[in-house]
Amino acid sequence: TWIMQGYGTMGLEAQEQLPEKPTHIFLQAGVGSMAGAVTGLFSAIYGEDRPVITIVEPNKADCLYRTAEANDGERHFVTGDMNTIMAGLACGEPCSIGWKILSDYADHFISCPDYVAAKGMRILGNPAKGDDRVISGESGAAAFGCVAEIMTNPELADLKKELGLDENSRVLFFSTEGDTDQENYKAIVWDGKYPSTHEN
């Protein structure tokens, strides 16, 4: 509970600095504490007019996605080797408090491969002219990479439409991790490790 309150403070500080209400919020998740806290905060602030909230997990540790997909009132766990570059999200058991909030207020759950997080790291570290550079690690860049993939991959056009993403969308992200593994950061951002598969 204390951890979630801290994440809620993070969300509130971000909300107070926003010039406009976001249309979408994409949140990376491990057990769901951060995602649950931020989802709960924005749902409390905006009520029925809240942004579209999407939860993003690595496909090797997608316990929230599996729980949402089952939709049977039970939490579903991921066991075994959760071998993902998104080490901070490699969690197999949903947080009960976080899941309660997410089950009520999150709109979508996405399970994504490692190359999506790598793409997010590269774009954030090498932004378009006029944008600020962000040094984000694998877990921190997962949600951003997910949106970048959805917006650029023609095979995901239906998902893009379902999420309501277009050139007018205002999307809020939280990068919760820097380059904690500097060698892997360089391998991904400098050397192109984990390339985007649809571009090959």
Each PLM stretch: what is its role?
Residues 3-4, 9-10, 21, 94-164:
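Active-site-adjacent helical/loop segments in soluble small-molecule enzymes
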Residues 40-50, 71-75, 152-153, 188-196:
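A glycine- and small-aliphatic-rich helix-loop capping segment at beta-alpha/alpha-beta transitions
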Residues 5-9, 13-44:
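Glycine-rich ThDP/TPP pyrophosphate-binding loop and its adjacent helix/strand module
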Residues 63-77, 183-186:
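Active-site-proximal loop->helix
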Residues 4, 29-39, 61-65, 139-147, ...:
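Short glycine/serine/threonine-rich phosphate/pyrophosphate-binding segments
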Residues 142-200:
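Phosphate-binding loop/pocket of nucleotide- and phosphate-handling active sites
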Residues 24-25, 45-60:
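Short, acidic/small-residue loops that bind anionic groups at enzyme active sites
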